Amino acid sequence: MANESEIQKTENAEVANAANGTNPNNERRGRGGRGRGGRGRDGRGRRDDRRNEEAGEELIEKLVHINRVSKTVKGGKRFGFAALVVVGDGKGRVGFGHGKAREVPEAISKATAAAKKTMIRVPLREGRTLHHDGRGRFGAGLVYLRSAPSGTGIIAGGPMRAIFESLGVADVVTKSVGTSNPYNMIRATFEALNDQKSPKAVAQRRGKRIADLFGRGGASAAKAEAEAAAVVE
């Protein structure tokens, strides 16, 4: 009888906990596992945002592509979303990131955070175009980049336009062949941008003056040196 009484008390306590929406065991797992982990991940994101605000850094964020994905598990399929985001400061720095999550906003947030961590600096001529032509390849994708005179605008489409707008380029001519996959186009474009070198960097690597690279003399040489000094690496 004593055992039956104890069992009955235990069952009554469990029913009361369920009615009140409390469960000591589940509550401990929430604090020690998912709860604390969730706060940690969200907390890091919020701290990163605060650091950007404190530094006065304003970033341009562009959603390039989003698609639905699925993962086959033992119980069936789990559906989610994948986002591709490009981030830049409009002053020569740009990055891209990819994120997956069950919900669209969370996928975009993950992609944005990843893009901020992979930003690269691209030297720009006069702060508006590339220093020289370039080419990049990734997978089946091949992209061509050409510097352009003032007033040309951004001749690019889709993912490539988002990159140059975020980068701060005002005049450029591009062409993409071989693929329409936005991921391949983005990676091929970044490969081409990574190969961009300013006259200042080339002169330092070769141990020459800027004017020597262009074969200039007199006032033209002084102008070339001044233009090179104004380039932000």
Swiss-Prot record:
Cysteine disulfide partners in this protein: none
GO molecular function, one term: structural constituent of ribosome
GO terms, biological process: translation
The keyword Transmembrane is assigned to this record: no
SUPFAM superfamilies hit by this protein: dsRNA-binding domain-like, Ribosomal protein S5 domain 2-like
Domain of life: Bacteria
Skewed-composition ranges (Basic and acidic residues): 1-12, 39-54
Keywords: Ribonucleoprotein, Ribosomal protein, RNA-binding, rRNA-binding
Domain S5 DRBM positions: 59-122
Keyword Transmembrane helix: no
Gene Ontology CC terms: small ribosomal subunit
Region described as Disordered: 1-54
Quaternary assembly: Part of the 30S ribosomal subunit. Contacts proteins S4 and S8.
Function: With S4 and S12 plays an important role in translational accuracy.
Annotated family: Belongs to the universal ribosomal protein uS5 family.
Domain notes: The N-terminal domain interacts with the head of the 30S subunit; the C-terminal domain interacts with the body and contacts protein S4. The interaction surface between S4 and S5 is involved in control of translational fidelity.
PANTHER family xrefs: MITOCHONDRIAL RIBOSOMAL PROTEIN S5
Name of the featured protein: Small ribosomal subunit protein uS5
